[in-house]
């Protein structure tokens, strides 16, 4: 039987092939010209248009590739189109026929070079033609870039220049189409690359990335792109997406750090790379030689291995004879796990893949670096701002891959900007002293991607990628967020203050969102077979995010984060607007539950890094970094350092080393150091890893010795419920305590009288069905009013009979407030509105604020007040208000913010921060200055000093020796210092207490009125005499200078002040009151150059221009004391018509001397009056 020869399979319809071939033949050729020059046919323009119709109406409409296959077989592009473009590329624009032919060629070039995509909806015809077309497109690119007679790309730029020169408002649809075709062709040239599964015949580099970059630079494509990018949004609007694709395909996979290395170091780096490759090859050969077959082992070897369970296994190979360890390693290598395979969508691995590294030639590196620098300087902000807005509004030109390309391009160029700055810094350091210093550039060149709109878009993009499990998009988003964080970190250390402020603002915006923290955590925890590049991106993001967040939280102790819990409560309230707290079934009563939850929300927003870092230290996070560490032989130093830092944080910073105590993890760590195939000891990270692993093993051995049962846990992953017990050997002690209701207060302006306040609170309680509590409080107040009235009447009767007994019992006894049942007792602790009503009624709490604390009516509340409270509550209880001026009474109350709340929240931040010594030692100094001596005490002190001097003169010869005196002096100073540290100065205490002291207020205003009257009399006398009062006081002070003994002031002048006048002339202090606001005016408007250190009063801050005194010596001039002294001097001046200057010399001995004030007509002239 004869075998029939196989028949040739027609891959294309013969009729279609004949039509296409006839059109290509009629287009033209070189056969009719002896010089080999291409000659067009008679109707070349018609042939070009017919070919375009065949591509459009046959291939595109019928979803076939037959026409493209025929054109590739007959070599239309390299044989016809490229020669035609070179022939007419330099033609004048006025030649319409040649311009049309050039445009027709461009219309064919674009579909022929359009990238062939591999997707899940490919037909049988697509699978047949795709490999051939991919190979043909590589040939197309090689022919276009390597055409020697003339530059093809520059000729095609000339096709689009007339349309680009037209203003955007005047361009037609045809002009926009020509510009788009030109850019699409450049995009196609950038995209086409040699497919990895197809062989390449030629060894040249005409189709590589380096050849593309060199051609773009030499044929002015980069100049065209820079022009369009810098004018994006003005002259060009619809070309942004195409330009993004060109940039993406030019820079993807390019190592940014290598791009900006110094030329002197480039050769060294290449040599180092070559040495590393050769060293890796030697290691592989060495490992292979250990197990390589020899001529004596050609017959093979097989042995039996007896395992622990008395079972036998067979292992082949001579290498198993070396020992037990080699035998078991061979057994482990032969084990295979048939992992179940799931059907996944077919995706072209080369499509939009930005992870594959690309190496460039030196010329391409130089050209690309030049283009990137110029693009960052002029085109980055306009292009990416326009792109972001187009993506946000989902413009028609935006495709599925646009967002991915956008975020990757942002990350790449941000990395390039940081690398360029580092390159410039190294250049300045190398040329330091040889050229003038150049001011550092601002980060405003990349400001368009560092605003809030970009962060919102990036968060939305990452969340969308997580929801739809688009891991390639998520990888681009993670890379972008990482580069943004690193750029902000560089901005924070910039010498420009503006950049530092912007960096602080950006960090606060990024770290303020708790959703960002949760997203980074979920990405790290949920890694599962997404690939190495996804693993590398997520671990890098977690490492950078955690490190920067730690630094930021240390710098901002009061850091706050916005939680999503509050939004959920608002949604729940919106869904059930009329549901009250009783129906909700909460633990708290009425609206107190909402207020307590709101307080809890505010507390949860207070960020604690220690608590947050614990969330990173989980078994899933450890598994992710373990998956990265398994590639330790392929990882670089930065990636190894990243994993090392995480394991160190888990084991030693967080004391969660038990998470690493698992058999596979321990085996991996041991293999990294001891081998086989471990880390290279010559690499820098080896020593760090060796020390870390040694400490981990040391910890493991110690814990196994303490708790041998932990051996069982080495087989399993750890869960959060048992991690603490496994680490410390005991359960975590948690104490739950009930918190009281949050203190409330009425909103400002809601009520001005006691009646209105009680009306609001009572109405709010009754609206929540708490009328029994209001009735109970009313009864308590009624009975208390009767009891207090009886005591007052009894006390009045007792006073008339025996005044001595009345003085012994001057205060009424306090009245205890007892709850009627357990529900009332709980409401006194948990119901915030009832507690507010109790405080309005004068009740006070005795003990600590816990459940069952005692409340009482203090003795200071008279019966009349209690009766008034009782009547007001009864009145509003009988007729409560449903709303007050159209507002719900419950909305007129708010949470009361107290200093205790602020201190407690602040303590939560600062409990782990070292602020120095906690004790009040010598470094802390005196916390409060002692109270100033009163007038009588000052005179008494002066007299005692005189007596001591006389006694010391008489007993000078019989005194103790120097050693005893020195010991006594040291003891006195030590005791005085200890006393001063314990002093709570009366000045500082009264600064806040006097605000609520009615008696002190009455006394203060009485003194103020007396001072105003005295000042008015002095002014009137000065106006009548027409002479300033200071003249008389000056004469009188000179006359009395010899009689009075002057006391040396306690505080000395500055050096500059003491040199301005002789030290013998000491003038006493002058104190002048301001009749406008009663403030103390010191040292204002003096013409003397001398100025002493004066207390920093408000007037001194406004008018004084000198430096304020040091805060180490706080001025504690008591207001009450000074006013009392001034009042006495004013009265003496008003009665006797004498100056108060002489008295001030002895009285105000504790204050610094001030310069003399200028007066005119009895008024003090300040510095602002000179003008």
UniProtKB/Swiss-Prot annotation:
Name the family the entry cites.
Answer: Belongs to the timeless family.
Query: Per the record, where are the segments of Acidic residues compositional bias?
Result: 954-964
* Region (Disordered), start-end ranges: 568-592, 880-1171
Q: Does the keyword Metal-binding apply?
A: no
GO cellular-component terms in the record? replication fork protection complex
Q: Which InterPro entries match?
A: Timeless, Timeless_N
Q: Where in the cell is it found?
A: Nucleus
| UniProt superkingdom | Eukaryota
The encoding gene is TOF1
What is this protein's name? Answer: Topoisomerase 1-associated factor 1
Q: Name one GO biological process term.
A: replication fork arrest
Q: Where is the composition biased (Polar residues)?
A: 1085-1100
Ranges of compositional bias, category Basic residues: 938-950, 1033-1048
The terms under GO molecular function for this entry are:
DNA binding
Classify the main location. nucleus
Assembly and interaction partners: Component of the fork protection complex (FPC) consisting of TOF1 and CSM3.
Biased segments, Basic and acidic residues type: 887-910, 965-993
Q: Keywords for this entry?
A: Cell cycle, DNA damage, DNA repair, DNA replication inhibitor, Meiosis, Nucleus
What's the stated role of this polypeptide? Forms a fork protection complex (FPC) with CSM3 and which is required for chromosome segregation during meiosis and DNA damage repair. FPC coordinates leading and lagging strand synthesis and moves with the replication fork. FPC stabilizes replication forks in a configuration that is recognized by replication checkpoint sensors.
